[in-house]
Amino acid sequence: MTSMKDPLSLDHHHHNHHVTGSKHAPLSMASSLQPLQRSVDSKHRLDVHTVSDTSSPESVEKEKGQSKNEDSNDDPSKKKRQRRQRTHFTSQQLQELEATFQRNRYPDMSTREEIAVWTNLTEARVRVWFKNRRAKWRKRERNQQAELCKNGFGPQFNGLMQPYDDMYPSYTYNNWAAKGLTSASLSTKSFPFFNSMNVNPLSSQTMFSPPNSISSMSMSSSMVPSAVTGVPGSSLNSLNNLNNLSNPSLNSGVPTPACPYAPPTPPYVYRDTCNSSLASLRLKAKQHSSFGYASVQNPASNLSACQYAVDRPV
């Protein structure tokens, strides 16, 4: 009986074990299928998410904004690079740059590099400094020219339009006849030629008006320039005859004034001038004879140093 029970028990036990094994098998299969389903679900979700993102432009813009924010948060040095940094020059650097600018306002590359080495600056800084300095120089030049045009040239051009009202307040137009030549204004002036000859330029009528007497005519005859002595003898003789007919006693009695000049120069110095101006001298002699002036004394009889007598060759 026991032997019969044993196989049954064994079979029963085996069956039970098989049943338990069959129960565990679906559990293991389900557990193995769960990760596969999760992976499939995740892939499906990713595909749907990408399709929805590409289809909507708003999501694309959001992604771009997020990427920019991430880049800006990752690299904050870009903002610092965009800012312009001011260079603070020392007095020695400015002195060297100004001295070079006075010599050359447009330095080339090699000169800028040399200046950069001297001043311990970069070539770009030196180039920018020269550019700004030239702009400042041009602005100053324009301002100076504008000031000159306003202050300097303006009054000059206005003065050309009305010169006498501004520059000469005491002057009036068309006042020559009313004023005339006053003795007070001329007596204060010095005339060395008249003072040397003891002649008053206002009292002697021979300088400003025709002579009124024979004595004044004789004085004027002595003051005739020396070039008149080169007039031919015929005209001189006619003038002498006219003077003798008028009053021969006065002609001989009036003394000749003292000559302030030195002795005459050699005779042939004035030869060319006398020959060239012979026609003009003849005309002057005729004018003297027509106005009634006294004639010049005969050069052959009475010559003085004042008359600059010229010995004509025979």
UniProtKB/Swiss-Prot annotation:
Q: Does the record carry Metal-binding as a key word?
A: no
For this protein, the record's CDD domains field holds: homeodomain
One GO term in the molecular function aspect is: RNA polymerase II cis-regulatory region sequence-specific DNA binding
Question: Which positions does the record tag as DNA-binding?
Answer: 82-141
Q: Where is this motif: OAR?
A: 276-289
Q: Which Pfam families does its entry note? A: Homeodomain, OAR
What family is reported? Belongs to the paired homeobox family. Bicoid subfamily.
Q: What is the protein name stated in its UniProt record? A: Pituitary homeobox 2
Q: Could you read off the lineage of the organism from its UniProt record?
A: Eukaryota, Metazoa, Chordata, Craniata, Vertebrata
Gene name tied to this protein: pitx2
